[in-house]
């Protein structure tokens, strides 16, 4: 409720100068509801304007379940098919979007979202509307530089040249620079790798605990390794770092250490489940929901108690769903 009032006070508006997307534009949407005719969505770059993905435009292949293709709450990249600005109808397609299109649109949306967040913050700070700041500064920068984020990046080094001719005060210019510098600061990446570790021998849980402990011990000043229980024998190795390659290498090293150690015990074995992934957004939320069922790895025996069969099957289904969605994304 508070967020809605803030948006109203700021007069929140679209990212770009044009009021409607154009035919053949790639845009980012959020799925609101699914009905017989299709999926109704909010167009995120155009102030949550409503559009519809027709059922015939969901997939090139036949499908039995709509939920396997699209889900309420998910973000999707779609192509604009038709725009009726008078009636406000916007028809969209998901099936005509290629993997390259998705990457291209996600990169553009990420850049535009950074700019929009900066605009909202600065507008609130100076008591003006988002649209007013867009009209005076941001939209002219889009026209001049192709993308306002590229302009603001250059402004951090050459502000006089970039802001020349814009009808904004020095205070607003300084606020724009201060905010965008913070948003351009490299953010730590979160990576995770799923593993199965078990021991049917005499040492059992103690062997698993020892192997996981060895895996955690490879942490250093640059990369910290955490290992958490999903449901026996499933565990997840998680790390956070600025260097993706370094983080992936460290998780692989932890996996090798764990594998080597558990195999020293009779009946002990190790299996990697899937690839090492960068997590964030919806994927991070799904992982947190899974981990909420169990505590992280510690010296307590409770962390290694076997869940009942229903809990284990439920966790496996959640993980499989997560992988399906990652492939769709």
From Swiss-Prot:
Organism in which the protein naturally occurs: Plasmodium falciparum (isolate 3D7)
Domain of life: Eukaryota
Similarity field: Belongs to the eIF-2-alpha family.
Pfam families noted in UniProt: EIF_2_alpha, S1
InterPro entries according to UniProt: NA-bd_OB-fold, S1_domain, S1_IF2_alpha, TIF2_asu_C, TIF2_asu_middle_sf, TIF_2_asu
GO biological process: regulation of translation; translational initiation
GO cellular component: cytoplasmic stress granule; eukaryotic 48S preinitiation complex; eukaryotic translation initiation factor 2 complex
Purpose: Functions in the early steps of protein synthesis by forming a ternary complex with GTP and initiator tRNA. May regulate protein translation in response to amino acid starvation. May regulate protein at various stages of parasite development.
Cystine residue pairs: none
Domain S1 motif: 24-95
Keywords: Cytoplasm, Initiation factor, Phosphoprotein, Protein biosynthesis, RNA-binding, Translation regulation
Sites bearing Phosphoserine, chain numbering: 59
Location relative to the cell: Cytoplasm, Stress granule
PTM section of the record: Phosphorylated at Ser-59 by eIK1 in response to amino acid starvation. Phosphorylates at Ser-59 in schizonts and gametocytes but not in rings and young trophozoites. Phosphorylates at Ser-59 by eIK2 in salivary gland sporozoites but not in midgut and hemocoel sporozoites. Dephosphorylated at Ser-59 by UIS2. Phosphorylation of eIF2alpha subunit of the pre-initiation complex eIF2 inhibits recycling of inactive eIF2-GDP to active eIF2-GTP by limiting the activity of the guanine nucleotide exchange factor eIF2B and thus, inhibits protein translation.
Region Disordered, annotated ranges: 291-329
SUPFAM superfamilies: eIF-2-alpha, C-terminal domain, eIF2alpha middle domain-like, Nucleic acid-binding proteins
Molecular function in Gene Ontology: ribosome binding; RNA binding; translation initiation factor activity
Residue spans of biased composition, Acidic residues class: 298-329
Broad class of where this protein is predominantly found: cytoplasm
Protein name: Eukaryotic translation initiation factor 2 subunit 1
